[in-house]
Amino acid sequence: MRCPFCRHPDSRVVDSREAEEGSAIRRRRSCLSCGRRFTTMEEASLQVRKRSGAAEPFSRAKVIAGVRKACQGRPVRDDDLALLAQRVEDAVRSSGSAEVPAEAIGRAILGPLRELDEVAYLRFASVYLAFESLTDFESAIAALRSEAAGPPTTRDGPARPVPRGAVDVSPVIGTQQVHSR
């Protein structure tokens, strides 16, 4: 590694440590020429392959900027956006691939954004999933509502689906279970 002070091409690693929760390595180096010390950070690169075929480095800032547009006017804090971007990066990096298609980034954004703010999710999804009609919005809203309603429940807990033509013989007598959300 080139010394930032004297530009000498060689340096010696004095110390190495994990940084940023294990996603990077921090190295203290000493220049073999001038003896001055400096710090470097090493992180595995993640390339995003765009639809045009061009590749560019993954950028959390770009994820935040895109999601921020969908969150405009919504009660979403910058900390929430930073956490969402971190979750997206973690999900994309967990694929183990050094290069991911841009579509994978969009898919990785949808889940955490849905948890963060449903209106922002609909805004983002309408662009990312290319909604073309009111029916597309209605379908997405219906899916959100059915998820919010949760599965049907009985007095003893979650209802189990009964195959057509079968009789549900689950016990109705016994200990009552309390389920909270």
Swiss-Prot record:
Record flagged with keyword Oxidoreductase: no
Chain segments carrying region Disordered: 148-181
Keyword rRNA processing (UniProt): no
GO BP: any one term: negative regulation of DNA-templated transcription
Single annotated GO MF: DNA binding
InterPro entries: ATP-cone_dom, NrdR-like_N, RNR_NrdR-like
Cofactor annotation remark: Binds 1 zinc ion.
Cofactor(s) listed in the protein's UniProt record: Zn(2+)
Family matches, as Pfam families: ATP-cone, Zn_ribbon_NrdR
Coiled-coil residue windows: none
Record's keyword terms, sorted: ATP-binding, DNA-binding, Metal-binding, Nucleotide-binding, Repressor, Transcription, Transcription regulation, Zinc, Zinc-finger
Zinc fingers classed as unnamed: ranges: 3-34
Domain ATP-cone: 46-136
Function (record text): Negatively regulates transcription of bacterial ribonucleotide reductase nrd genes and operons by binding to NrdR-boxes.
Homology family: Belongs to the NrdR family.
Protein name (database record): Transcriptional repressor NrdR
Gene source species: Frankia casuarinae (strain DSM 45818 / CECT 9043 / HFP020203 / CcI3)
Taxonomic classification: Bacteria, Bacillati, Actinomycetota, Actinomycetes, Frankiales
